């Protein structure tokens, strides 16, 4: 693995390689000698899992009777099938029609260059749906290949599983042969299955801005490309093979451990023939990726609603790809680029059916996932985490119970919550439903060995245990060897009488049926509120819920809706005396860091940077080094509860600016008035405004802005090509906060003032020189202009609001004076000395 690039503004990004473990090579020797060696070699590779007990079932052997003409896939024959079978003492009449929604042969294969003749055939099999005995509440969903039926029947509250009986007697009437029909009974105490479905015929949702902290369905419309080496190797089976690989990759993205409803949808399949000027595919993985990314963009359409549009592209090749130092590379992709048309792409070296995990791994990078051994992932996964996840840096047997690590789930969740997956919200109009059968049914162990090690390779049957690791024959230095790449047998591969592999285990067919039935997930209860992010000044606390009641299984729908909620906390004012704002404290935490700039001799002071920061980046910790004048993103996120800007009451929550009122309550509608009084009516202050035109060379006092002033605005307009006056600010102690000592600040900047107040300055070279801020000022400020020439047609205007004087005791009215005078005269008249002369 190596990182060779970066993508600013999206956390860690770059180009990543996925490597392969070195093959184990063993000479073909008698089994008795080899057993102990294999036990040692495979001990670390075998999955530790307990076999599930089969659920109670009833079953019968049946012979489906076809009542209408043959249905020949791809031949234009009637897409309707009537079938009758006797089971459980009842006659079941199946009225089936071809389901266009799952019609594999509906996919258009696009050939660029000379199309290979062997690839023009249609795929075997038709998907049929219908009813049973005319019951509108019943459901029949079956796959028909001209000689066998495979699928599920739901009739009168019972669930029936129909499949061909291996080694069964053919039907004497020429119809389907012997099948086995199982009636599955729910386990005792098991409640009804939650199965949420979208209404049939419902319109596709339009792309919209993602809700924050919500689980939303994402549809990854994928272009699959195979080069000429793939066509030469796979021949007529290339299309079926690619769909099988992508089906396994899509299944990985459906696993609940990814904690998001992600559907991988193949919308276009392109096969490159000879004579086509396609991407330059060579040994260098990096150069191949760059060439493919540039080439695929020309095939895309810009409109997301266009049926030919795709969100990501993936190239399969038989070319041996090499990284910087070795040729163990199996794939490469950029990180965090899923909605970037120029970089949402990946390349995969075809290595057999396990290439599905390579494809899932590279697409994981496109979703911003890092390798599980990266520094951020080590802390998120914990010390007990294994290396058997999709995003492991080296290909290994992926844990079927948890294919995605906690780190992968966290990174894709944060990525989508921050709006980077906006292009995935539109549902494809005509999606291709990938093969539903397990790949091992179409590719036995020998064929899997051929796909991995070449056409002469065969499965080594003498090497136990079955399913855990695929051992294949080969030659090294003229000697016959058995070799493995540590990948398990493909799911569905026969491993014994009435047994097949699943997740690296050999299971009975009864147990295998449990993996065919999707189960939709359901939300669990909300968890308790977490700690507040701040002790004062307005923090944020969270509560979350998980998709665990029940956990989705076998590709069942993941929960949709809000997974995290948050609220304000500790909104009271912080104690007076703190000279720094909350964001200033976060920047100042880097003041003693000497490892950021090796060329700078010592530590430096960091202050927040607001000017020039894009609105979408307000919640990154962007700080400016006062000594150098440069500014950098020191943290991808500020602490939750940090104000988005000095002029806003909105706060940052998980890297996004969320509206809050001036009372520091998220969602509140309270606002500051012009006097900066929360919820006030503006009556507590008055506007002061004026202009200045008496310019003389040097610094000129314009006005003293008093302490407590709010909504300050100063604007100087004139011909910027002949400007000769500039704004300046002087503090009470005689020092300058802006443009003092005949030194100008040419670019936009934040003027930091005592009392954690800042004003935004446009820069001396701006077309309209301005100075603005909400205040209130903690101390008086003298506005000056620096005259450096003969000002012509220059206008300087200013305005601000000042608090109204506190009203004193009201003056008595004339009536009050008359009444009080009468009282005094009456008191004097009653005095003993009154009236004496």
Swiss-Prot record:
Cofactor(s) it depends on: Zn(2+)
GO biological process: defense response to bacterium; extracellular matrix disassembly; extracellular matrix organization; proteoglycan catabolic process; proteolysis; skeletal system development
Any one GO cellular component localisation term in the record: extracellular region
Cofactor note as given: Binds 1 zinc ion per subunit.
CDD domains: ZnMc_ADAMTS_like (cd04273)
Domain TSP type-1: 520-575
Annotated spans, Spacer: 686-837
Pfam families (UniProt xref): ADAMTS_CR_2 (PF17771), ADAMTS_CR_3 (PF19236), ADAMTS_spacer1 (PF05986), Reprolysin (PF01421), TSP_1 (PF00090)
Protein name: A disintegrin and metalloproteinase with thrombospondin motifs 4
Gene of this entry: ADAMTS4
């Amino acid at each position: 693995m190596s990182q060779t690039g970066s993508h600013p503004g999206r956390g860690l990004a770059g180009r990543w390689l996925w490597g392969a473990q070195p093959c184990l090579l063993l000479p073909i020797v008698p089994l008795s000698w080899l057993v102990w060696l294999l036990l040692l070699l495979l001990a670390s590779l075998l999955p530790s899992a307990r076999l599930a007990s089969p659920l109670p079932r009833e079953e019968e052997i049946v012979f489906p009777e076809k009542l209408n003409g043959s249905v020949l896939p791809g031949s234009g024959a009637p897409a309707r099938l009537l079938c009758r079978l006797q089971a459980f003492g009842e006659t079941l009449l199946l009225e089936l029609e071809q389901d266009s929604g799952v019609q594999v042969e509906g996919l258009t294969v696009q050939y660029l260059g000379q199309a290979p003749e062997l690839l023009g055939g249609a795929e075997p099999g038709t998907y049929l749906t219908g009813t049973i005995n005319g019951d509108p509440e019943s459901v029949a969903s079956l796959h028909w290949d001209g000689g066998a039926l495979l699928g599920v029947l739901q009739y009168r509250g019972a669930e029936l599983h129909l499949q061909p009986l291996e080694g069964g007697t053919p039907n004497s009437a020429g119809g389907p042969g012997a099948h086995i029909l199982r009636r599955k009974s729910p386990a005792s105490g098991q409640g009804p299955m939650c199965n949420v479905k979208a209404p049939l015929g419902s319109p596709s949702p339009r792309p919209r801005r993602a809700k924050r902290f919500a689980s939303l369905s994402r549809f990854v419309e994928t272009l699959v490309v195979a080069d000429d080496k793939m066509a030469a190797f796979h021949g007529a089976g290339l299309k079926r093979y690619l769909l099988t690989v992508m089906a396994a990759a899509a299944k990985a993205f459906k696993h609940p451990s990814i904690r998001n409803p992600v559907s991988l949808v193949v919308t276009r399949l392109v096969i490159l023939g000879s004579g086509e000027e396609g991407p330059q595919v060579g040994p260098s993985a990096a150069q191949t990726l760059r060439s493919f990314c540039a080439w695929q963009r020309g095939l895309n359409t810009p409109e997301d609603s266009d049926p030919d549009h795709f969100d990501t592209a993936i190239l399969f090749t038989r070319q041996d790809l090499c990284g910087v130092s070795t040729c163990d590379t199996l794939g490469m992709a950029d990180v965090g680029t899923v909605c970037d048309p120029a970089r949402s792409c990946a390349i995969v070296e075809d290595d057999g059916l396990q290439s599905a995990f390579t494809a899932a791994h590279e697409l994981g990078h496109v979703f911003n996932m890092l390798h599980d051994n990266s520094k951020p992932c080590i802390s998120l996964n914990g010390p007990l985490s294994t290396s058997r996840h999709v995003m492991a840096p080296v290909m290994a047997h992926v844990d079927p119970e948890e294919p995605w690590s906690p780190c992968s789930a966290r990174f894709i969740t944060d990525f989508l919550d921050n709006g980077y997956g906006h292009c995935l919200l539109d549902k494809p109009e005509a999606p291709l439903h990938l093969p539903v059968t397990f790949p091992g049914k179409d590719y036995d162990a020998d064929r899997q060995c051929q796909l991995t090690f070449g056409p002469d390779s065969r499965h080594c049957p003498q090497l136990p245990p079955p399913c855990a690791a695929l051992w294949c024959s080969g030659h090294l230095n003229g000697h016959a060897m058995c070799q493995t790449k540590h990948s398990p047998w493909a799911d569905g591969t026969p491993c014994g009488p009435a047994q097949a592999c699943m997740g690296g285990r050999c299971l009975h067919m009864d147990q295998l049926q449990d993996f065919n039935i999707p189960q939709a997930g359901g939300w669990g209860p909300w968890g308790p509120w977490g700690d507040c992010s701040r002790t004062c000044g307005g923090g944020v606390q969270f509560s979350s819920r998980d998709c665990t009641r029940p956990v989705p299984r076998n590709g069942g729908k993941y929960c949709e809706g809000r997974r995290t909620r948050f609220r304000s906390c500790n909104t009271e004012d912080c104690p007076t005396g703190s000279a720094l704002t909350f964001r200033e404290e976060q920047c100042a935490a880097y003041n003693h860091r000497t490892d950021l700039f090796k060329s700078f001799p010592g530590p430096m002071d960091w202050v927040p940077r607001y000017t020039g920061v894009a609105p979408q980046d307000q919640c990154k910790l962007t700080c400016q080094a006062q000594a150098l004048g440069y500014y950098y993103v020191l943290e991808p996120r500020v602490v939750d509860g940090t104000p988005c800007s000095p002029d806003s009451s909105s706060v940052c929550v998980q890297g996004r600016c969320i509206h809050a009122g001036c009372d520091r309550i998220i969602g509140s509608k309270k606002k500051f008035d012009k006097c900066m009084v929360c919820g006030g009516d503006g009556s507590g202050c008055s506007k002061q405004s004026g202009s200045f035109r008496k310019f003389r060379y040097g610094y000129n006092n314009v006005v003293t802005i008093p302490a407590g002033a709010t909504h300050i605005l100063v604007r100087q307009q004139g011909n910027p090509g002949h400007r000769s006056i500039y704004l300046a600010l002087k503090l009470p102690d005689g020092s300058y906060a802006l443009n003092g000592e005949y030194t100008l600040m040419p670019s936009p900047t934040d003027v930091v003032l005592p009392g954690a107040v800042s004003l935004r300055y446009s820069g001396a070279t701006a077309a309209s020189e301005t100075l603005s801020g909400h205040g209130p000022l903690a101390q008086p400020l003298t506005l000056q202009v620096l005259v450096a020439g003969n000002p012509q047609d220059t206008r300087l205007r200013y305005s601000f609001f000042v608090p109204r004087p506190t009203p004193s005791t009201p003056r008595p009215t004339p009536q009050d004076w008359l009444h009080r005078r009468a009282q005094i005269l009456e008191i004097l008249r009653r005095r003993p000395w009154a009236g004496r002369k």
